[in-house]
Amino acid sequence: LQLTDVFREAVAPYAALEDLYDMEPDAGLGNGGLGRLAACFMDSLASLDYPAMGYTIRYDYGLFKQKVVDGWQTEIPDNWLPGGEVWMVQRQDSAVTVRMGGKVDYIWRDGHMLPVYKDCDEIIAMPYEMIISGYGDGASVLRMWSAKSNRVFDMKSFSTGDYARVMQMQNEAELISKVLYPSDDHAEGKTLRLKQQYFLVSASLQNILADHMRRWKDIRRLPELAAIHINDTHPALCVPELMRLLMDEHGLGWDEAWDIVTKTMAYTNHTVMAEALEEWDQSRVKMLLPRVYDITLEIDKRHNQHLRSKYPGDENKIKTSAILYYNKVRMANLAIVGSHAVNGVSALHSDIIKNTIFHDFYLDTPEKFTNVTNGIAYRRWLCQSNPELSARIADLIGDKFVKHAEELDKLCKFAKDKSVLEKLGEIKLTKKKQFADYVYKKSGLVIDPSSRFDVQAKRIHEYKRQLL
């Protein structure tokens, strides 16, 4: 908004603006590669004046704060909401219900098969909104879902002293939005993660369709007026869930619903390691999401029929491309089958997925595959993070680069300009001194600003390769 200097002057009699920045916690919504990319999407879409809505879970506790004590990792809860929720507005009128568990029976009525849900757990998804400002006057909306129990408080049991059971019933639903990335090295953790994924997907799609119907009245125009981005496989249940909503709630037949789904969804893949592609036990999905599992079963059956028709006798195509295989639900395969566009995040990455892990998909539908190289929101990581450097760049090439990154190419002509390089070196040293002051304030360590800093802003984990 270009108001930093105005606010710095306004608060100067009372505090330094940087001290106020330090008081505001980072939103505990995911700060790894996926979270960073999603945040940059929101900034870019807002700056380019595209109408956009991002969806996430409103976690009570974000990714744990990590300390190393005597060589061992110590995890501390990231209680970010006190201080962080000041930017949020609750939208109680847009709350939706998400159903899990139970069983589904089917009845035929007027030539249509209708699901009948029995003994389901109903969870209220309560939305909160945060406005994401772009450069200038553009803005996007981030909608966050908080899980609330739909069960009526059992006053009778509470009055008879059965407090633990009453509170357990209330708390089970609310666990869904309690912690970002709960541990999944045990069965309960795996189930909770699957609940989180479906909770996010179902609540968000219900909201998207309700918004679409309020504005446009015709569900068949959805692909024309909306695009849904599956950012890695965590939201891949979008595919069967949108099918469920279109068929069960809007009365469409399978073929018409599938046409809408595949024209609306787009999937970004983030890993080239086959062993890292997300899978769920079929039994877990069937138990927790019986209707979604049945739809996934039908999607898989029809996709396999297509492959057998196109490649008769080549069962290896089924082995690599089936959604359900060896008692697993393969989420990347589900996302690819249900999307009209599939991209990697760099030219090399996109080539690898076409030639290795998704090669059979590429042979079948090469028109789906494309590349979208990941960038960064440099207004955040250059202009805001380093205003001195940003101001110097503006002196050299003008300020159009703030909205047009290609303008930065004009800096190449200064590559051997000694005076320019000296000035850039001075700015770099200033920032290193500021960082040294920060390290001293936070840890008591004194570091030499003239030394070389090799920094990896990642949590400590063996696959992050800090030992390199």
Task: Tell me the role of every PLM-derived stretch.
Residues L1-L468:
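A conserved ligand/cofactor-binding region detector
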